[in-house]
Amino acid sequence: MDNQLFFKSLIATLPKWIHKCQTSKHENILYTNPNSLFQLLYFLKYHTNTRFKVLIDICGVDYPSRKRRFEVVYNLLSIDYNTRIRILTSVDEITPICSVVSIFPSAGWWERETWDMFGVYFSNHPDLRRILTDYGFEGHPLRKDFPLSGYVEVRYDDSEKRVVSEPIEMTQEFRYFDFASPWEQMSRSDESNQK
């Protein structure tokens, strides 16, 4: 499948659903908004010219400096055309994404994992609950603002003969993270010095 022709036909067919298309390292990437995601994935699965019938994975990425800090990534495979495509959408902490379990039944566990690790809420999910962390776990551990030590210490108490959870005392309640790389600024100044 020719990437340029494929993208042109997709943009012509779905101009409201696709914000941007790009090919990076032989990977096809589409950007869409959360409101159009369900319709776009339905189209990509069932249309004759696409047939992306296999959902390979759903994952999340946290970019705290962005207004829509969470990027949710859907990786699809078309066995008929031997092609892969990546669909990206971005949401903030309170905007839900429509669940795609009704299109791809395998999405159930991946959406649960993304919710458990990042806190991205999937509306209309049949069973949205934690999948990797404990039932009483507080927070979402793959967020960049989640403390490395966590909020509680879980250990086995030999005197009580059971597992106990105790809150960790934080010396620092809130930390500000500067995610800008100091190396980027140095490389820019080196380039200007060479000119």
From Swiss-Prot:
PROSITE patterns in UniProt: COMPLEX1_30K
Family (UniProt): Belongs to the complex I 30 kDa subunit family.
Family annotation (SUPFAM superfamilies): Nqo5-like
Gene Ontology molecular functions: NADH dehydrogenase (ubiquinone) activity
Primary role: Core subunit of the mitochondrial membrane respiratory chain NADH dehydrogenase (Complex I) that is believed to belong to the minimal assembly required for catalysis. Complex I functions in the transfer of electrons from NADH to the respiratory chain. The immediate electron acceptor for the enzyme is believed to be ubiquinone.
Catalytic activity, EC: 7.1.1.2
Disulfide bond residue pairs: none
Keywords on record: Electron transport, Membrane, Mitochondrion, Mitochondrion inner membrane, NAD, Oxidoreductase, Respiratory chain, Translocase, Transport, Ubiquinone
Keyword Ribosomal protein carried by entry: no
Subcellular location: Mitochondrion inner membrane
GO CC annotation: mitochondrial inner membrane
Quaternary state and interactors: Complex I is composed of about 45 different subunits. This is a component of the iron-sulfur (IP) fragment of the enzyme.
Protein name, per record: NADH dehydrogenase [ubiquinone] iron-sulfur protein 3
Reactions performed catalytically: a ubiquinone + NADH + 5 H(+)(in) = a ubiquinol + NAD(+) + 4 H(+)(out)
HAMAP family: NDH1_NuoC
